[in-house]
């Protein structure tokens, strides 16, 4: 397992610099266009993507799904892998809360949902969520770091409410 992580880190170190855009305006306007990286959504943890579509944005995560019981969303979704998952959100992008020469502190809110399909049999997972996010949009690099509060309602494999849920994203913008 350790060798796999070493190869993954080497591959990431070689690929990420090739993906970083060389256009000057991409460094100063990280909220335009398309962002790609890693993150979590409603039930999904994996590859995160965000497409700006004014006045808002579509955000999605494709990755793995996990849960511990039939009580819906919760911290158990990060404990183990049960299958594959897709999370989709629509976010309303709001004006910056603060601006510095290094980053803009932006915020958004919206609604989303997620579907998880177990790979070893069992009941799929379905949940809906509200999203309220803080975005650190860096102005010297085409990066964003987003932290989201994400209260969710699990619909399958059982109805449950997760009022304390947080997710995060780290993306490169193109």
Short names for language-model regions:
Residues 1-29:
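Cleavable N-terminal export/targeting peptides
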Residues 20-77, 85-86, 173:
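Short glycine/proline- and aromatic-enriched beta-strand/turn motifs that initiate or cap beta-hairpins
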Residues 25-35, 65, 103-105, 128, ...:
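A membrane-pore/channel beta-structure motif
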Residues 30-32, 41-45, 80-86, 105, ...:
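Residues that define the transmembrane beta-barrel architecture of outer-membrane proteins
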Residues 52-143:
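Gram-negative (and chloroplast) outer-membrane scaffold detector with strong preference
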Residues 67-70, 139-174:
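Predominantly the C-terminal beta-signal and adjacent terminal strand-loop region
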């Amino acid at each position: 397992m350790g060798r796999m992580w070493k190869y993954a880190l080497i591959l990431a170190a070689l690929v990420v610099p090739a993906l970083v855009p060389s256009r000057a305006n991409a460094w100063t306007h990280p909220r335009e266009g398309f962002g790609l990286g890693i993150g979590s959504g409603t039930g999904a943890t994996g590859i995160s993507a965000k497409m700006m579509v004014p006045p808002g944005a579509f955000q999605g995560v494709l990755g793995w799904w996990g849960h511990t019981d039939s009580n819906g969303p919760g911290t158990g979704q990060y404990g183990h892998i049960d299958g594959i998952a897709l999370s989709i959100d629509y976010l309303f992008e709001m004006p910056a809360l603060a601006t510095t020469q290094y980053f803009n502190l932006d915020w958004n809110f919206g609604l989303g949902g997620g579907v998880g399909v177990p790979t070893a049999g069992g009941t799929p997972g379905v949940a809906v969520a509200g999203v309220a996010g803080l975005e650190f949009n860096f102005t010297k690099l085409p990066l964003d770091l987003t932290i989201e509060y994400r209260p969710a309602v699990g619909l399958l494999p059982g109805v449950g409410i997760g009022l304390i849920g947080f997710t995060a994203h780290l993306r490169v913008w193109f």
